[in-house]
């Protein structure tokens, strides 16, 4: 015969358990089991974990997850505490920083709240960087701007400090971006028009961290965070057979940029009838294997899609591209309407002589470039002269400049008349000029639409392609990725999973 027992549970036992505190006091009863022993010594926090704990004033024995209410959003923290001071002075992101789920979101979390310490390049990372540079040099002949800058610095070193400041006005960042706009936008866009592809093209966009949307109009640029990136390869698909042979192009030849851009636009418009745009990313591997983790593969796909979308958005019209490029300069605290110092102007001309010389001469004469946003923005220089007349002669005389030019180009450009550059310029060279020409170059892609993206895996030792993974360009997939990135960077919401 069975017996039935009745129990009465006290009311306090029916209450929901209190949430655990975010420290080890809640686990005090377990301390005897968890305490270090001779067999089980204590594990100190890793250097990165220790940085996070120090930021929030917590001891080495504290749990690593500080209370969420004490955390500023990751992007705010990233631009206030960063091993690279430029991100604090010029808040921005890279495309790779948007790939928050490529390995583990918590790893990104600790990276940011550890103050984004600068990493010492590993041997494998250096190998990959060198490999990318070799691919670029094979496709695009160019002069290293640092070697030209070194020669310019030698000349400036013999001048008084006040004179140097005048000749380098705008600063080193303005010089760097101007060179990048010429080499990695203007020249690369022309290369695609003539050869069907280009490597290492600079692209950028703006991500609204509140809505998770990428800017697509002038009215939404100001609401977004600047995101920069370098696309490993932009190409036409299928490759235009015989296109490069029918239209030989020497990037060192002297170009009339106005007609050159008009001709390139006409060719690209014709090609758009039976070609599409493809962006590729090159991943280097030490061995003949490729990543198997789906999150890593998807991140590489998303990276290419960001580049493709940036290019498509910039190419929609010249005025949008111009405003977007001007905003990129402005976010770096550079006034695009202020002249670049003559020393910087000379260095840029030596580095990219064939591309820039005819435009330099047009500016010196006061000619318009037939690009309304730029022409309107710079007309005041024609009627209202700057404090000192702008001229390359303020830096060096023409014979000295020609000697410098010959050191890098031989006698290739010896017959080009540049005398007007050493007289008073009617329109000083400004960052706005580089934005204008880059905008016109990006407009070449107006009618070309992305249909696919591709990730190439290369063996860094043999130089061979191990595998190519192609994906259709899908705006919905990209929108999901950008919203996920904005949610993490703008508000910090993570899955807390290793994916």
UniProtKB/Swiss-Prot annotation:
Cofactor mode of binding and number, as noted: Binds 1 [4Fe-4S] cluster.
Keywords attached to this entry: 4Fe-4S, DNA-binding, Exonuclease, Hydrolase, Iron, Iron-sulfur, Magnesium, Metal-binding, Mitochondrion, Nuclease, Transit peptide
Entry annotated with the keyword tRNA processing: no
Places the protein is found: Mitochondrion
InterPro entries given in the database record: EXOV
GO cellular component: mitochondrion; nucleus
Annotated organelle transit peptide span: 1-12
Region (Disordered), start-end ranges: 1-27
First-tier enzyme category under EC: hydrolase
GO MF terms held by the record: 4 iron, 4 sulfur cluster binding; DNA binding; metal ion binding; single-stranded DNA 5'-3' DNA exonuclease activity
EC number: 3.1.-.-
Residues in coiled coil: none
Keyword Disulfide bond annotated: no
Function: Single strand DNA specific 5'exonuclease involved in mitochondrial DNA replication and recombination. Releases dinucleotides as main products of catalysis. Has the capacity to slide across 5'double-stranded DNA or 5'RNA sequences and resumes cutting two nucleotides downstream of the double-stranded-to-single-stranded junction or RNA-to-DNA junction, respectively.
Record-given protein name: Exonuclease V, mitochondrial
Organism (species): Clavispora lusitaniae (strain ATCC 42720)
């Amino acid at each position: 015969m069975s017996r039935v027992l009745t129990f009465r549970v006290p009311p306090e036992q029916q209450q929901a358990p209190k949430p655990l505190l975010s420290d080890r006091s809640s686990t005090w009863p377990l301390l005897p089991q968890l305490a270090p022993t001779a067999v089980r010594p204590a594990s100190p926090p890793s250097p990165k974990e220790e940085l996070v704990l120090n930021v929030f004033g917590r001891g080495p024995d504290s749990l690593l997850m500080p209370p969420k209410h004490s955390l500023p959003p990751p992007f705010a923290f990233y631009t206030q505490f960063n091993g690279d001071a430029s991100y604090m002075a010029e808040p921005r992101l890279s495309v790779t920083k948007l790939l928050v789920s490529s390995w583990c979101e918590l790893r990104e979390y600790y990276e940011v709240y550890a103050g984004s310490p600068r990493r010492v390049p590993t041997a494998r990372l250096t190998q990959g960087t060198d490999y990318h540079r070799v691919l670029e040099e094979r496709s695009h002949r160019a002069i290293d701007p640092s070697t030209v800058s070194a020669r310019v610095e030698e000349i400036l070193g013999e001048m008084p400090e006040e004179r140097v400041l005048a000749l380098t006005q705008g600063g080193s960042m303005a010089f760097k971006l101007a060179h990048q706009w010429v080499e990695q936008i203007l020249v690369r866009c022309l290369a695609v028009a003539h050869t069907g592809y280009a490597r290492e093209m600079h692209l950028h966009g703006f991500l609204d961290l509140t809505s998770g949307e990428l800017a697509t109009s002038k009215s939404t640029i100001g609401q977004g965070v600047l995101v920069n990136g370098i696309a490993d390869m932009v190409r036409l698909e299928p490759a235009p057979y015989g296109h490069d042979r029918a239209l030989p192009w020497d990037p060192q030849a002297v170009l009339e940029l106005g007609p050159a851009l008009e001709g390139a636009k006409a060719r690209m418009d014709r090609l758009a009838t039976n070609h599409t745009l493809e962006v590729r990313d090159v991943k280097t591997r030490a061995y003949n294997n490729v990543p198997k983790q789906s999150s890593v593969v998807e991140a590489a796909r998303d990276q290419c899609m960001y580049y493709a979308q940036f290019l498509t958005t910039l190419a929609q019209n010249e005025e949008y591209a111009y405003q977007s490029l001007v905003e990129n300069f402005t976010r770096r605290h550079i006034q695009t309407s202020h002249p670049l110092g003559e020393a910087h102007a000379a260095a840029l001309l030596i580095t990219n002589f064939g591309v820039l010389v005819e435009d330099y001469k047009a500016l010196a004469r006061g000619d318009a470039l037939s690009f309304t946003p730029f022409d309107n923005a710079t007309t005041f220089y024609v009627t209202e002269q700057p404090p000192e007349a702008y001229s390359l002669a303020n830096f060096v005389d023409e014979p000295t400049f020609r000697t410098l030019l010959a050191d890098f180009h031989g006698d290739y450009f010896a017959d080009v008349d540049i005398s007007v550059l050493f007289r008073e310029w009617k329109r000083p060279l400004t960052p706005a000029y580089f934005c204008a020409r880059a905008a016109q170059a990006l407009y070449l892609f107006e009618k070309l639409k992305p249909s696919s993206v591709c990730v190439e895996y290369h063996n860094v030792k043999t130089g061979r392609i191990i595998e190519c993974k192609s994906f259709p360009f899908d705006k919905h997939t990209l929108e999901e990725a950008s919203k996920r990135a904005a949610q993490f960077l703008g508000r910090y919401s993570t899955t807390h999973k290793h994916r």
